[in-house]
From Swiss-Prot:
Disulfide bonds join 36-86, 47-77, 48-60, 87-98. The lineage of its organism: Eukaryota, Fungi, Dikarya, Ascomycota, Pezizomycotina. GO terms for cellular component: extracellular region. It holds the Pfam family Hydrophobin_2. Keywords: Cell wall, Disulfide bond, Secreted, Signal. This is Class II hydrophobin 6. Belongs to the cerato-ulmin hydrophobin family. SUPFAM superfamilies: Hydrophobin II, HfbII (SSF101751). Residues 1-16 form the signal peptide. Its main location: secreted. Aerial growth, conidiation, and dispersal of filamentous fungi in the environment rely upon a capability of their secreting small amphipathic proteins called hydrophobins (HPBs) with low sequence identity. Class I can self-assemble into an outermost layer of rodlet bundles on aerial cell surfaces, conferring cellular hydrophobicity that supports fungal growth, development and dispersal; whereas Class II form highly ordered films at water-air interfaces through intermolecular interactions but contribute nothing to the rodlet structure. It is found in: Secreted; Secreted, Cell wall. Induction: Expression is up-regulated under Alternaria alternata cell wall and Alternaria alternata fermentation liquid treatments. Expression is also up-regulated under nutritional stress conditions. Expression is down-regulated in the presence of poplar leaf powder but up-regulated in the presence of poplar root powder.
């Protein structure tokens, strides 16, 4: 029983550790876009329709094209009438934990 607890704790810690690029400069670009906060939590760019109290976002979709900068991310979401957000993994269009992209003027 203790083995499974220790093994689970070890694996959870290993998976939660951020990936470092080859130069040792921080988060690898493949994990989070430069317009989302660094780390693993808010690494999913989403275009959301409804923002509830700045925390929960409803009716979210992935951007129709891959944004490369914050301004292009905002422009892509504006074209479909939504707001750019960086979210935790959304489930069924409900992104319950989201934040504004880095450098956004919302």
């Amino acid at each position: 029983m203790q083995f499974f607890t220790v093994a689970t704790l070890f694996l959870a810690t290993a998976f939660a550790a951020p990936s470092v690029d080859t130069n040792g400069n921080g988060i690898a670009p493949r994990l989070a876009a430069n317009f989302c906060p660094p780390g693993l939590l808010y690494s999913n760019p989403q275009c959301c329709q409804i923002d509830v109290l700045g925390v929960a976002d409803l009716d979210c979709v992935s951007p129709p094209s891959g944004p490369s900068k914050c301004k292009t991310f905002a422009g892509i979401c504006d074209k479909i009438g939504r707001q750019p957000k960086c979210c935790v993994v959304p489930v069924a269009g409900q992104a319950l934990l989201c934040t504004d992209p880095v450098g956004a003027n919302n």
